[in-house]
């Protein structure tokens, strides 16, 4: 997934020769995730979480190969097909968050979801290494280095099938029989009170959580897609851009475990609000910066803010949703989040083309104000309990 913000905008500009459509790659990925999110959620609610993860791995593998071939052939149409397939796979694999929510008791649900995000550190760490390897092999073999980076992705995907197979029983089954796996105190000490809430209260909590996730996801994708292109305009090397994206990803995932623990300890709401504020501050820093390290620091903060707001929102949604409907609930969150991730990069491209990166940063900061106001209205009595 980290190859998309690293290479996607550059590939589109190379294939089309127009920076105005630089966000198209990220938007295509988001569109495919929009189209699959809810349906994969229904699939996992009916057939278990592992079914969704297997589907996602297969689609990701095939999509990466198609993108690599499209780059070699110089075909934008084939590139779009590959991005659609790859994006669908990435979207399906997101059911891992539902699996984590299923496998942990309410008092540790934030921690469980955050551990999945921690696993993404592998991707953020391996991405610059993969790009660096592709650069060296590309020069040695006379192959386009960007295409080669995508063609190497299946080597990383194949071992994941064995990891998914090792999960027993299916996480959904664990959620339905939670008392078999955890002591009573762990189940009662915190967590969902969805049965006690009326439909209006449930709706308010879900809207606040989904709006926060949608905004911070769209803002993060927009900033990342455009800043990669801005760094390219500063004559930064592909390795420098990849390193910048890796630092952004470190912000997204490196602190997710303590953030998840914090959400379990002090509540989902304060963690979400803090994340939104940090994401807005990072966007402002990007808008004010002209150099490599200032922009990179800003995108790191955007990633860190995303971690708090997005993980907290996912945890809040699962708090008020029973196991038999969690896949669909997170599917709805994914649908709207990726709809924002689809449209905002295109808007970001137009802002950069019509104005500059400074205006993009200010716009990114303004986006978080609405979810901050809505989330402030949520009443969380204790972590995972709402009224």
Q: Where in this protein do the model-derived segments appear?
A:
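Helix-loop boundary and gating motifs at the non-cytosolic
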Residues: 1-31, 207-212, 220-231
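Intracellular juxtamembrane helix-capping segments at the cytosolic ends
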Residues: 8, 91-104, 308-321
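Helix-to-loop junctions at the C-terminal end of transmembrane segments
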Residues: 36-48, 255-267, 352
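C-terminal ends and interior cores of transmembrane alpha-helices
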Residues: 58-73, 278-290
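Hydrophobic core of transmembrane alpha-helices in multi-pass small-molecule transporters
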Residues: 76-91, 294-308
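Cytoplasmic helix-loop-helix junction between adjacent transmembrane helices
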Residues: 84-118
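Helix-loop-helix hairpin linking two adjacent transmembrane segments in secondary transporters
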Residues: 116-165
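C-terminal membrane-cytosol helix-exit motif in multi-pass small-molecule transporters
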Residues: 154-179, 374-379
